[in-house]
Amino acid sequence: MSRDIQYWAGLIGGRVPMEDLMRNELLLGNEAVALGAVDAGISGVFGYPGTPSTEIFETVERLASGLGPVSTGGVCADWSPNEKVAYEEALGMSYAGGRCLVTMKHVGLNVAADPFINSALTGVNGGLVIAVGDDPGMHSSQNEQDTRVFADFARIPVFEPSNQQEAYDMTRLAFEYSEEVGLPIVMRMVTRLCHSRANVLLPGDSGEARASSLSESGGKGLPDPDDWTLVPVNARRRNERLVRMQPSLVRDSEICEQNMLRLVGARGVITSGIGYNYFREAVGAESEGWSVLKITRYPIPVSLVRQIVDHCDELFVIEEGYLYIERHLSGLLGLHGIALRGKQTGDLPQTGELSPDLVAAM
């Protein structure tokens, strides 16, 4: 049960049928992210087009056309000349107190690298979420780079949904978490999740105007403007703050309710994102006999990884993109005596998209 459903169920005390408060819609993963952002009360969306991310902006833009001005709960939607400009516009709106979404594909994050990396030091005021569409298999891209690695480099948290419902729910949560920790949050999507459809349970008023976060100063009020000026004396102080935050970000990942840890058999799988769906499809009913850790938030939840490692004799790692989780396992835990199978062992290919057939052949 999502946090929204729990909230409404508690609020009405069971007096109103849930079906009168919620509705189902068949949505692309991109549309789910867009609706999650609008329902989180964003004041703006900025982006640069690029498959597989384009529909996120287009969906918000379409909704924004009927929501009126920002001052009355509407959304400013602007395509930008490039991803760097889009990120800087979104960051400026966040500094002013508004919640803001910025969209781009994975290679677009290269263009936005300067403000992206430095925004981890300046921090944010209103919630700032970067929806990035990775393109494993290079359907319309020049490389397969994995946004999790880039975000790790910048020390910025990543949310990675495995289905359209999680894409909606986790986008809303990402804005709350961004304001809680004062950092931008990356929402990592991949092509198959961006462009596939599934039913998503939405609040009855989904897509309607919200109170403008910008007019309310959003976030935590007005921070010290020196935090936004990264001359060395300020940058050193902000860098120390960012480093001190990392253990608490790991703890937040460990208690994230979207993660799933099930300890059953001696064979286990650590998976994330759409890789979890491929595992379920490949193994079928037998999946109930497997120990499973599904990771939905980064930094990697170390204590959950330790639990499944201690429980299992053999571990499989199924992740779309780079060997991000797999490479962290050895460094985090020193997997002595445990058979670890994944991309490093050649059980899965290191290039191209995963599929249920590839997972079944492991």
For every predicted segment, state its role.
Residues 2-33, 40, 161-362:
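Flexible, low-complexity linker and terminal segments
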Residues 2-164, 169, 192, 261-263, ...:
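Thiamine diphosphate
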